[in-house]
Amino acid sequence: MTTIVCVRKDGKVAIGGDGQATLGNCIEKGTVRKVRRLYKDKVVTGFAGSTADAFILRDLFEKKLELHQGHLVKSAVELAKEWRTERALRRLEAMMIVANDSEFLLVSGSGDVIEPEQDVLAIGSGGNYAKAAALALLRTENNLSAKEIVAEALKIAGDIDIYSNYNHVIEEV
């Protein structure tokens, strides 16, 4: 399990994730990089779920980005279509948040593509904790950037969620 959170503030979008990989009730690795840049460093993605499945989906999404010249929504919708229709892909257990400098989306395990109503998206076992923390920080008077809000939200989720750690990777577009 994991925590991935994405925040948009002041024209910037930041995605961050923890680095813990578990197998059952055991921590297998604490330095998994679940947030990565794609398509000429203009798109960032973060994944939760089965690590192998997430890598497959990330690679497929990257191919869609290349095919559609970096168009985020078109690439996500095409990935979702393939995810729903391709028998082998339907068994993959993962979710992704994908973002560029102007939009971000949740691509769910059932092949849904969801654009958030608010400036926060979060997935994984610690996702609800991170989302609540990020929303609270966005609603209060402060000078925190999107990246700083992501960092704080990940810390709070890590304090609560036993499947998330403090080894964070945060990218901003």
UniProtKB/Swiss-Prot annotation:
Reaction(s) catalysed (UniProt annotation): ATP-dependent cleavage of peptide bonds with broad specificity
Keyword terms: Allosteric enzyme, Cytoplasm, Hydrolase, Metal-binding, Protease, Sodium, Threonine protease
Residues reported in the UniProt entry to bind Na(+): 158, 161, 164
BP-aspect Gene Ontology terms: proteolysis involved in protein catabolic process
Enzyme Commission number(s) from the entry: 3.4.25.2
Main location: cytoplasm
Entry's localization field: Cytoplasm
Top-level EC class as recorded in UniProt: hydrolase
Gene3D superfamilies, A to Z: Glutamine Phosphoribosylpyrophosphate, subunit 1, domain 1
GO molecular function: metal ion binding; threonine-type endopeptidase activity
Entry superkingdom: Bacteria
Any single GO CC term annotated in Swiss-Prot or TrEMBL for this entry: HslUV protease complex
Means of activity regulation: Allosterically activated by HslU binding.
Subunit-structure text: A double ring-shaped homohexamer of HslV is capped on each side by a ring-shaped HslU homohexamer. The assembly of the HslU/HslV complex is dependent on binding of ATP.
The protein's role, per its UniProt record: Protease subunit of a proteasome-like degradation complex believed to be a general protein degrading machinery.
Family, similarity comment: Belongs to the peptidase T1B family. HslV subfamily.
Protein name: ATP-dependent protease subunit HslV
Organism of provenance: Mannheimia haemolytica (Pasteurella haemolytica)
